[in-house]
Amino acid sequence: MIYQPAEDSYLMSRILKEKVPGLLKLNPELKFLEIGAGSGIHLQTAKTLGIKNIFSSDIDKASVSHCNLLGFQCIQSDLFENIQGNFNIIIFNPPYLPEDEREPESSKRATTGGKKGNEIIIKFLEQAKNHLSLEGKIFLITSSLAEDVNFSQLGYNAKEIGCENLFFERLCIFELTREQI
């Protein structure tokens, strides 16, 4: 199932439009990775902003095929399982909702982040360290419906850089960098 753009997708696109131009000035050859590319909306935003080195992955075969048809390099991967190399920007609009037995199996993979909603995010952050350049940034979406993640405990500095209130939840994007030892 290809995850279709929704409020969280539009929030991420807005943040990319705010942040990427400044990062490109510092490094015109920066490498961009999206985990969970879905419909390719963020890949298209990255391309429009002038990023040349765009890579992506998704666990869903249909999403991978769709993004490849759009002209992007996309591989099938469960988080970083099949990813090689380091990246200056890594973005992730993860499945972040707590498990709900009423949700159809067909959509759970795209929306459910585990029993508490944060398990996939934690797994992502544990693996991302091995692929984030020393000065790199992660842009990550979270939801108030999921249990909070202790970013510092996972080795990251975190700054909330954008939020949107919906009638039932608050979506936020965090900019994460490696904690300097």
Specify the residue positions occupied by each region the protein language model found.
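Conserved class I S-adenosyl-L-methionine
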Residues: 28-38
